[in-house]
């Protein structure tokens, strides 16, 4: 059994997790396209599904209408002003997130498809760059991040479905289903952002691996210990590989910047809505625990919400740190030729790396890094302390 586990390819498992997650997003009506294999060369292609897209949009519009009609009166009847305010924030965030998905699917459909096609084309180009045959997605880091994300998705779906067993009538069941459809569907934008940044990190990682192993070996093969001339044919081959590596690196930065610009605002809006929902859920579990028969399950949802933010931040950090790895390889220091064009090429490439460095700055306000995790955790601990003090002062704890 252990020997079989050792033979399992982690990149292949990562690709399987992505395959399952893609179909999960299609069920929730967020992913309205299909990714399949071309019969001629087995490459992945994107196929648009217009009828399925309009069906998903209709379901989301019905869900938004149902939440406004059935959930808003319930929120208006809440007596506690603090809880009513939080529930209003949660309901507003859910509706805004649903509308945000509709806008993305209607107004930015072509841009999304072009971006996904660019990602698939880049992966094919990077695989052709290396002589090593790669199957799957990413490496060990990408696998473990995807595994934790998949566990979060499964727990999220399980927790939401468990809410349906204790509803009194069919109207409550319908309203709850619509609310669940909106909430889980809106969270898929965060998951798509996570996968997108992780894809950028995987692309950078593969190109860095090619430069560190194969390209460096080819550059060393051109060194002449006695200062002899380098063969033109051999130099031309290495120059072609270097040009292709530089071109791929520039293309990854361009596609990553396009992805960030396209999903920057939706991810930020839905992330803020998720934070509101987490604060409300933690408040109710602490102050009104009698409403929940499964308190441990509810605290699991709170932890899962923390994990979503942390995993998204780690994916961004992985992409940013991988984009800076090329400068640390010091490939420009190989004394292979005295041609000025060769050294000028590397100087221009390194200058572009500094100028077009891949960075993630939501709305230009701050740069996403691991410090965001500490800031988020410290703010949530402060909020928990405030809620506990409020419960003690009002004799609810």
Swiss-Prot record:
- List cellular component terms (GO): axon; dendrite; membrane; neuronal cell body; plasma membrane
What is the protein name given in its UniProt record? Answer: Putative gustatory receptor 93c
Transmembrane regions = 13-33, 88-108, 142-162, 180-200, 267-287, 296-316, 372-392
Tissue expression notes: In larvae, is expressed in neurons of the posterior pharyngeal sense organ.
- Recorded family membership: Belongs to the insect chemoreceptor superfamily. Gustatory receptor (GR) family. Gr93a subfamily.
Q: What does this protein do?
A: Probable gustatory receptor which mediates acceptance or avoidance behavior, depending on its substrates.
Write down the membrane topology: Multi-pass membrane protein
Record GO terms (molecular function) = ligand-gated monoatomic ion channel activity; taste receptor activity
| Organism of derivation | Drosophila melanogaster
Where, in residue ranges, is this chain on the Extracellular side?
34-87, 163-179, 288-295, 393-397
Primary location group = membrane
Q: Which UniProt keywords apply?
A: Cell membrane, Membrane, Receptor, Transducer, Transmembrane, Transmembrane helix
Point out the signal peptide segment. Answer: none
Name the Gene Ontology biological process terms. chemosensory behavior; male courtship behavior; monoatomic ion transmembrane transport; sensory perception of taste; signal transduction
Which InterPro entries does the entry link to? Answer: 7TM_chemorcpt
Q: What subcellular compartments does it reside in?
A: Cell membrane
**Gene label:** Gr93c
Q: What is the lineage of its organism?
A: Eukaryota, Metazoa, Ecdysozoa, Arthropoda, Hexapoda
Q: List residues in topological domain: Cytoplasmic.
A: 1-12, 109-141, 201-266, 317-371
Superkingdom of the organism of origin: Eukaryota
